[in-house]
Each structure stands twice: as C-alpha cells, then as structure tokens.
C-alpha cells in the first residue's frame, strides 16, 4: 500500500502517532475514525483538517469512519477548555447532529458500494441503552483514576484558576475511549485520529481496546498538528468570527476571500494542508509565486482549490466575479448577477444612504442624487465637475450630467452603486 504517513508528513498534516501505526497502514486496508462533536449545526474551517485527513485515508485505500458525537456532545469535551461547557438540550443536539451529518456527506460518499466505503456512525446509538451501573462496571473498572488524572486536559483544569472540573466532563475521556472499543469490536476499527489536543482522549481509547479486547487486541493513534497562522494567531476565524463550511453561515464570497487574503507564509503552508495538489505542482506554484508575489498566484490557487472542494466550481466562479467587482474588472451585467447578500458583503464598509422609492417615480437628476440626496459630493458644482471629467459611473456604466436615475436602474430592485474614479464607491438603498 502507498505510505499515508509519509504523505501526511510532507503536507504538514502529521504531529504524532503510536508505535506501529505507520506499519499497520502499510500492511493492510485499515479502518480509522475521527469524531466530530455536535457543538453547532455545522462545521467551520477548523474542522477541515480532520475532514481532509479522512479523504486522504480513503484515497490511500483505507476505510474512513466519521463519528458524530450525539452522546459525547451531551457532555462536552474538556480538552483545551479552561471553563466548563454549557450543556446543550436534546432538541439543539438533534439539530446539530443532522447539520454535521449533512456537511460530512458533501465530502465522503457514505452510500458507496466500494470495499473501503466510508461509514458514518453516531455514538448515541450505542450509548443510549448503557445504564450508569453497567458503564461503571464494564468501562470504569478498566481505567484507574490515576491514569485519567495524568491527562493534560484534566491536569490543566484541576490545577488552573477556574472552578475545576465536573464529574460529567471528567468522564468524557471514558466515553470517547469506549467509542473506540465499540468500533474496534463492531467495525474492526484499529486507528483513531484527531487533532494533537485529542491525544489524551485517543490514548485512553487505545488503552481500553487493549484491556477490553483481549490479549491479541491492537489499537493505534495518529494526530495532526493544531493549525496556526504565521503570526501565531488562531486559524479558522476572520474579523466576523468563524468561517463556516455552509454558505448560509459564511457566504462563498467571504469563504473565498478568507483564503485569497492569506499571507505569503500562510498560503505556502495552507496549500499543502488544504488542497490535494501533488508535491511537484505545489513546489512549482511556490517557485512561481516567489518571482512575483504581488500577483498572489499562490493565494488564488489555494482559494480556487478549496472553494471548489467545499462548495463547487460554479460557486467559485460567482465568488471570483464578485471579487472582481471591487477591483474594477467587471461589467454592469456582473453587478446585476449578485444576490442581495453578496452585494452587501462586497460593499461592506462602503458609505450608504437611503432614498425613498417614490422619489424615483418621476426620476431624479444625477446632480441632485450625488449631492443633496446622498452627500457623496459636497456641492452641486463639485458633482458637475466630476461628471464633466467623465469620472462618475452608475452601476458600473459611465454617465453624463443629463442622466436621470429611475427605478429601472435598481439592482435587486433595491440598490444603486455610485462610483467616482477607480476606488470611491457609494451605495444607495431604495426604501
């Protein structure tokens, strides 16, 4: 079999693994799982590393298992958290589980008939009938409190300045550990993967498999590094918060812009992690980018590849069209194709003013619009000089002083875009 660990290492997707993991993956088709807890009804780009890891696993001939944590989500993972998580109610959890299943289904074909077809499971299905007494006897008996207390996620909470850790969160690693044993027993799953912050929980699982599975039981672990930006700040957030994988939470335009705006150092790192381009292609792109960094070749290729992967080629083309509007490489037709949400996002931060729709019934002369109605220009004289200089556009089309603004000029029946020169924009919202 091809060497998956070697592939992960050059891409920057490998952090650590248990002894024997690489040999197991080279020896035979191996089932491996990653857990996704339903803390929200979608996933953001912070989860992309784990999704991509499952896709690489599949591409290298192994079987990926995506576990949605309907049970573990009821408790909350304490790893990397300084405070107790708020418990989610069942209705919210059910909605979140459905949302995450929907997202994962875009990247892995769970209906495939292949031998190594991806599987999706929900740990609530096997935990819901487990009584506390049975769990304490069958699982709790196998792992000592000393072992659990030695985990970093536990030590940091207990030795920190907060309120410590509840018994509920303390048991999280046992439930996650039992997930591994359940998948080992029922799906012949030998490997659990996750972010490096999950090492403690994952190794509890490998320990449980060995102690519950008998003397021939084997279990392996592999983790990915936590992704940070070159400046050390947290990856996955923009100024507006999380960058989501659902277009109704983060538009395709904003998703595309997030990657296009990456620094050179970040783009060089991200293109290895977040795309499936081969090493030769990536090395050539990096070399080409370094000859003309101002063209942002690397960032554009990164944004294109991951936008197609997460959304589609069609959505990528729309995002590129929307991006071109701000930089002058667009037409009036391109502007009219924008939906309301994308229009407002493209021109976020641009000065705006409202005009009553009734004012447009008989038409408004452009000088009145530019000065009195919007304040885009300070005086009629200044507006006329700009018009005479042929520097005013309405919806990307140059106009003269005799232009009259009417309802026929509205974009989405609501907006008008004014432009003076190359970079001065003004949006009229008609109400």
Swiss-Prot record:
Q: Which GO terms describe its cellular component?
A: cytosol
Q: Which Pfam families match?
A: SYY_C-terminal, tRNA-synt_1b
The record lists the catalysed reaction(s) as: tRNA(Tyr) + L-tyrosine + ATP = L-tyrosyl-tRNA(Tyr) + AMP + diphosphate + H(+)
Residues involved in ATP binding: 237
Q: Which residues bind L-tyrosine?
A: 33, 172, 176
Highest taxon above the source species? Bacteria
Q: Identify the EC number(s).
A: 6.1.1.1
Domain S4 RNA-binding stretches: 364-431
InterPro entries membership: aa-tRNA-synth_Ic, Rossmann-like_a/b/a_fold, S4_RNA-bd_sf, SYY-like_C, Tyr-tRNA-ligase, Tyr-tRNA-ligase_bac-type, Tyr-tRNA-ligase_bac_1
One biological-process term from Gene Ontology?
A: tyrosyl-tRNA aminoacylation
'KMSKS' region, short sequence motif: residues: 234-238
> Where does this one sit in the cell?
Cytoplasm
Among PROSITE patterns, the record links this protein to: S4
The principal localisation class reads cytoplasm
Q: Where is this motif: 'HIGH' region?
A: 38-47
Q: What class of enzyme is it?
A: ligase
Which molecular function term from Gene Ontology is one that the record holds? RNA binding
Please provide the record's keywords in A-Z order: Aminoacyl-tRNA synthetase, ATP-binding, Cytoplasm, Ligase, Nucleotide-binding, Protein biosynthesis, RNA-binding
Is the keyword Nuclease in the record?
A: no
Q: How does it assemble?
A: Homodimer.
Q: Any idea what job this protein has? A: Catalyzes the attachment of tyrosine to tRNA(Tyr) in a two-step reaction: tyrosine is first activated by ATP to form Tyr-AMP and then transferred to the acceptor end of tRNA(Tyr).
Q: What does the similarity note say?
A: Belongs to the class-I aminoacyl-tRNA synthetase family. TyrS type 1 subfamily.
Cite the HAMAP family for this sequence.
Tyr_tRNA_synth_type1
* Protein's recorded name: Tyrosine--tRNA ligase
Protein's organism: Flavobacterium johnsoniae (strain ATCC 17061 / DSM 2064 / JCM 8514 / BCRC 14874 / CCUG 350202 / NBRC 14942 / NCIMB 11054 / UW101) (Cytophaga johnsonae)
Q: What is the lineage of its organism?
A: Bacteria, Pseudomonadati, Bacteroidota, Flavobacteriia, Flavobacteriales
């Amino acid at each position: 079999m091809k060497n998956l660990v070697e592939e992960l290492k050059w891409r920057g997707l490998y952090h650590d693994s248990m002894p024997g993991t690489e040999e197991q993956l080279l020896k035979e088709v191996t089932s491996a799982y990653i857990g996704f807890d339903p803390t929200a009804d979608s996933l953001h780009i912070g989860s992309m590393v784990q999704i991509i890891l499952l896709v690489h696993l599949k591409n290298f001939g192994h079987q990926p298992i995506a576990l949605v944590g309907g049970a573990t989500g009821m408790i909350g993972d304490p790893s990397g958290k300084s405070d107790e998580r708020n418990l989610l109610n069942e209705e919210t959890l059910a909605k979140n589980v459905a949302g995450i299943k929907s997202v994962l289904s875009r990247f892995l074909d769970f209906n495939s008939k292949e031998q190594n077809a991806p599987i999706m499971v929900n740990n609530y299905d096997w935990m819901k009938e487990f009584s506390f007494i049975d769990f304490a006897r069958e699982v709790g008996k196998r792992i000592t409190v000393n072992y659990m207390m030695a985990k970093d996620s536990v030590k940091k909470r207990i030795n920190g300045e907060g309120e410590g850790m509840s018994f509920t969160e303390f048991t999280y690693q046992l439930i996650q550990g039992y997930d591994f044993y359940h998948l080992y027993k029922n799906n012949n799953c030998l490997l659990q993967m996750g972010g490096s912050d999950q090492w403690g929980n994952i190794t509890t699982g490998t320990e449980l498999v060995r102690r519950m599975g008998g003397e021939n039981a084997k279990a392996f672990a592999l983790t990915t590094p936590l992704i940070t930006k070159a400046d050390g700040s947290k990856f996955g957030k923009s100024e507006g918060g999380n960058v989501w994988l659902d277009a109704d939470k983060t538009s395709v335009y904003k998703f595309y812009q997030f990657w296009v705006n990456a620094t050179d150092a970040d783009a060089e790192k991200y293109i290895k992690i977040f795309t499936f381009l081969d090493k030769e292609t990536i090395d050539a792109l990096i070399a080409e980018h370094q000859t003309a960094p101002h063209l942002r070749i690397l960032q554009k290729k990164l944004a294109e590849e991951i936008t197609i992967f997460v959304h589609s080629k069609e959505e990528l083309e729309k995002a590129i069209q929307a991006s071109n509007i701000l930089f002058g490489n667009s037409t009036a037709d391109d502007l009219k194709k924008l939906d309301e949400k994308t229009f407002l996002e493209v021109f976020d931060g641009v000065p705006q003013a409202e005009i009553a729709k009734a004012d447009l019934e008989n038409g408004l002369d452009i000088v009145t619009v530019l000065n009195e109605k919007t304040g885009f220009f300070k005086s009629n004289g200044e507006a006329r000089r700009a018009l005479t200089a042929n520097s005013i556009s309405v919806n990307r089309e140059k106009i003269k002083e005799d232009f009259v603004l009417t309802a026929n000029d509205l974009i989405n029946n609501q907006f008008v875009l004014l432009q003076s020169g190359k970079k001065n924009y003004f949006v009229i919202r008609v109400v």
